[in-house]
UniProtKB/Swiss-Prot annotation:
Gene for this chain: atpH
Protein name as it appears in the record: ATP synthase subunit delta
Pfam hit, one: OSCP
InterPro entries: ATP_synth_OSCP/delta_N_sf, ATPase_OSCP/d_CS, ATPase_OSCP/dsu
GO CC annotation: plasma membrane-derived thylakoid membrane; proton-transporting ATP synthase complex
Organism from which the protein derives: Nostoc sp. (strain PCC 7120 / SAG 25.82 / UTEX 2576)
Length: 183
C-alpha cells in the first residue's frame, strides 16, 4: 500500500466528520473557503508545513499556532484542527482538507476541472472552459484549478476526474509523432 493511499484512508473518516459538523451547523461553504485558504497556506509556506508535520514540536505549540492562524475562522473548524493535534493526526491535514473539498464538491454536484495551459488564462477563457466542462459533465457547477506549464507551447489540457482533454500543441505534436512512427 502506497503512502498516498494510506494517507487517503486515514484522511477520509476525518473529512467525513468535518463535513458532518459543517452540515449540522450549515457552514459547509464557509468551511470550504477556510479549507482552500489553509491548503494554499500549507502549500506556499514550507516552514508552516514543517512545523505542523514535526513530531518533536510540542502539541501545545502547534495548538497555539492554529489558534493564531485561525482566529477569524469558525470555532468548530478551529476545534476540529485542535483535535487533530491531540489525536496526532495533524500530519494528515492537507489530505483531510482535500478530501473535505472533494466531499463538498460531491454534495454540491460540482466537478473539479484541472486546467493546465501554456500561459495564464483570461477571465473569458476560464469562462469558456467552465462552459465546456459543464456541457460535458452535466454538473451544476465547475471548480477550476488552473496552472501554467510553458512546456505545452500553446493550448490547454483539461482533466475532469479520469477524463483528459488534451488540446495542447505539445499533445498534438506527440500524437503526430506517434502516427508518423507507426506509418
Amino acid at each position: 500500500m502506497t503512502s498516498k493511499v494510506a494517507n487517503t484512508e486515514v484522511a477520509q473518516p476525518y473529512a467525513q466528520a468535518l463535513l458532518s459538523i459543517a452540515k449540522s451547523k450549515s457552514l459547509t461553504e464557509e468551511f470550504g473557503t477556510d479549507a482552500r485558504t489553509l491548503l494554499n497556506l500549507l502549500t506556499e509556506n514550507q516552514q508552516l508545513r514543517n512545523f505542523i508535520d514535526n513530531p518533536f514540536i510540542a502539541a501545545e505549540n502547534k495548538k497555539a499556532l492554529i489558534k493564531q492562524i485561525l482566529s477569524e475562522a469558525s470555532p468548530y473548524l478551529r476545534n476540529f484542527l485542535l483535535l487533530l493535534v491531540d489525536k496526532r493526526r495533524i500530519f494528515f491535514l492537507p489530505e483531510i482538507l482535500q478530501q473535505y473539498l472533494a466531499l463538498l464538491r460531491q454534495l454540491n454536484q460540482t466537478v473539479l476541472a484541472e486546467v493546465t495551459s501554456a500561459v495564464a488564462l483570461t477571465e473569458d477563457q476560464q469562462q469558456a472552459v467552465t462552459e465546456k466542462v459543464l456541457a460535458l459533465t452535466k454538473a451544476r457547477q465547475v471548480e477550476l484549478a488552473t496552472k501554467v506549464d510553458s512546456d505545452l507551447i500553446g493550448g490547454v489540457i483539461i482533466k475532469v476526474g479520469s477524463q483528459v482533454i488534451d488540446s495542447s500543441i505539445r499533445g498534438q505534436l506527440r500524437r503526430l509523432s506517434l502516427r508518423l512512427s507507426n506509418s
